[in-house]
Amino acid sequence: MKKKTGILDIISMAFLLILSFIFIFPFYWILTGAFKSQKVTVKLPPEWFPLSPTMENFHKLMQNPALQWLWNSVFICGITMLIVCVVSSMAGYVLAKKRFYGQATLFSIFVFAMALPKQVILVPLMKLVSFMGIHDTSWAIILPLCGWPFGVFLMKQFSENIPTELLEAAKIDGSGEVRTFSSIVMPIVKPGFGALAIFTFINTWNDYFMQLVMLNSRAKLTISLGVATLQQEFSTNYGVIMAGAAMAAVPIVAVFLMFQNYFTQGITMGAVKG
Amino acid sequence: MKKILSLGLAAALMATTLAGCGGSGGSETTAAPAADTGTTAAAGEAATTAGGSDAAAPAGAVEITWWAFPTYAQDADKPAGTYEAEIIAAFEAKNPDIKVNLETIDFTSGPEKITAAIEAGTVCDVLFDAPGRIISYAQNGKLVKLDDMFTDEFVKDVNNEALLNSCKSDDGSYYMYPISTAAFCMAVSKQALEAADAMSCINMEGDRTWTTAQFEEMLKKLNAAGFNGATVYCSGQGGDQGIRAFVTNIYDSQVTNDEVTEYTLNDEGGIKALTKIKEWVDAGYMLNGSAYNGGEDVDQFVAGNTAFTTLWSPGLASQRAETLTQNEIEAIALPFPSDDGVPELEYLVNGFCVFDNGDAAKAEASKKFIDFMCNDEEWGPKDVVRTSVFPVRQSMGDLYPGDEEMGFYASLTKYYSPYYNTIKGFAEMRTYWFPMLQAVLNGDSTPEDAVNDFVTKANQSIANAQ
Amino acid sequence: MKQSKFNKIRMRETLISYAFLAPALFFFCIFVLLPMIMGVVTSLFRYNMKGMTFIGLDNYVNMFKDEVWQKSLVNTLILVVGSVPITVLFALFVAAMTYEKNPFTRSFFRCVFFLPVVTGTVAVTVVWKWIYDPLNGILNWLLKSMNIIEKNIMWTGDKKFALWAILIILITTSVGQPIILYIASLGNVPKDYVEAAQVDGANDLQVFWQIKWPSLLPTTLYIVVITTINSFQCFSLIQLLTSGGPNYRTTTIMYYLYENAFKRFEYGYANAMGVVLALMIGLISFIQFKALGSDVEY
């Protein structure tokens, strides 16, 4: 295919690069800001790169239970991811491949609930969680997020790919439902598994709202909530806040970069052919 | 894993159903007993693993939780909670049968956290705060009465009816045990004023009282010399008492009537004050503070970006001392300017309350702990000094001998105005305050309309809370 | 005979299916459905710290009369109406620019535009707060040093700018997913159609509108749905940046709900808002999903 490079292309490309710069900037600023001294962080004109990097902010950050926060985030995201993956792949498979009573209704309810922002059930959810005695624990975030039906929806999409003939052949061979699921279904939906896992992990990590409402104790905060708290306590000290923000952002960005193909796939599968 | 979890959950749910889905009283008690029964051990264990921080308490010990706003000053560079931990260590040494767990909270998200925790039944036992919120919790029946702590000796020692009344709810019982108090005031930067040749505008004699005319003169000089005035901060409710006192003082208005039964800010003086402030902001003498809250306004002041601030107290002075020195700024505290030169100041009262968590032993232990913090021979005065303000107990005397600045702050107590922070619906009123200022500053409505609207809504909030 | 056998099979399938669905339904019913029902029920009560009193539909009546609620509804709609077209065009532009590049470049740009989403609202807001700061912020400094403005502008506190300032952050934190979707679906446009059209002498614009755009329609509709829902939920930006100010200019329904629940302690009222918000979102997504559904089965 022949392509001539016109002025328009160059302008568009330049525009694209400027936009990229704006999108990278916050992350870049957090990373570099974490190593700047307090005075430098609010300096104008800004110091575009830390000329005299310092670890001072991290020392101050460590006087807070920042590592505990980080661990809480990892724990919450990890467990949520596990439960969501198992539960959703089972449900997604039958929704895609079985014909049963109530199927259509059930699926519509799931789809409707998916569109519902969880914030609207905030107060009752909090009441419920406290009835169970798990308010202000990691489970107060994990369990409600496991109820969110996006995973079911996504896994249904992936399960549509399972050839029906294969399932029927298995049935004729006398394979039980559980075996069919583990030996035929699972291998086929594996990419979906990866996509859902990473998707859940990232979304849970950044689910500020749930964390804000469900967690109180300083030792139980997640890293994002911890940073928001720091922002309020240390409003004067940008350096420490940046160090905290870096601690919240770097791990999750790293995870994203490592698994971005799965992630992209998850997003695409969850959407097209809806 | 999943199975255990589901079991635990199911059990927890059962417990819930059995306890009945009735009033909120039930919610606080369900959690604890459920964890004791064998069936729900899984849920209990899960919760503990998640937290992972519960240290084992000695057998038979009462465990209480203390939530503290950053009211005690910390030693330089120490994180929130360091001093509090020292108090706890000293208390636990004397009372080995009580274990105190500390949580530090901040002023921005703290109040909402407390609300959430009250709803969820996970609120602390002891809270260190001020009457505004504490009395509203009392009015909602969430607190333990502290009448037995207000002994005749204590009441006589405090000898200040207004202050004692601020610790009472409308049922006549005491719910807050006060430790220290001080007036809110404002502060100017000596460096800026000197550079703008405006030192003559302020009064450094006596109680440093001054008039609105002098204040306006100072604004003009600062502006001419290129300094920014303070922000009329109103992005949120943090620190709003400072700017509210500023508004009421400049033309001698009052937030409420003397009986604290009705809002009266829409009197002539209040409207005039808001009109004047709008004028000042439009002329660039003061900054439109719709993007700043009280804390951020103080940040700008101590960073040297603004020449004065309308939110200052001895506590803030000590918390920000280090930054001020770094930026080579000397802050001079002043009362608010007023038309007649006699300020009417709002004041803070620091004190403790005890939440009713349905456990008498905890309530007793909490009271003991509060008593220790306020009345221990060694720690009482020390704690007062850490709040950087003045003891409510007259018998403690002058805790800041020879400190001229503190002497000035102490002199302001005679200008205390009626304390309205315990008015019903106070919390709701605060949510109307800053939008009102924003409406005025951004020209959405005239000062008169805005303040009338505010007073209507605020008065409605009193009715709502009945 | 045949019918009953069929029913038997179907019955069996149903049993098995529900066994597989059980865990998902368990979580869903307890943590989504039950709170939803509780929310609807309590929205009929005057429900605060003191207790509950049944007041029928009063909360709803008051809500529609509540000026602040009306303002938040308008703000929310402005955010939706503002973010949806910009997001679509922006995403389309980036995707069109990058989908034919080599895989490395493509995934580079994909990552770049997804970065703010992954970084998380809290961390990103820390930086934006500084960008918008009237006195120390970089935006005012930049504009002043380029002589575009003379006086500092109070981005998040000025009634003319506040909502737009929020909108910009909202877009940067939500455009990542649409870009990924567009890149994927542009890659799916059959090459032969495009080439055939080019042979027929169609220019780039014609190729785009007549060949590519129709096959992008389902994706576009889906993007419209998710961006709409996303904008309806805008909360943390407001909570972290403006507290709804100035004078309720950035209060969204979601933020107002939060304020009512946690600052005014009016849980019943907050729940009523939640119900209405859910209905609005439900209705909008229903319409959009319908449209999507009919278009997709090609």
Show the residue positions of the predicted features:
Chain B
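C-terminal motif of bacterial Sec signal peptides marking the signal peptidase cleavage site
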Residues: 16-20
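Hinge/lid segment of periplasmic solute-binding proteins
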Residues: 45-53, 57-58, 106, 130-185, ...
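Long, aromatic- and glycine/proline-rich binding clefts that accommodate carbohydrate-like moieties
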Residues: 331-334, 382-435, 439, 464-465
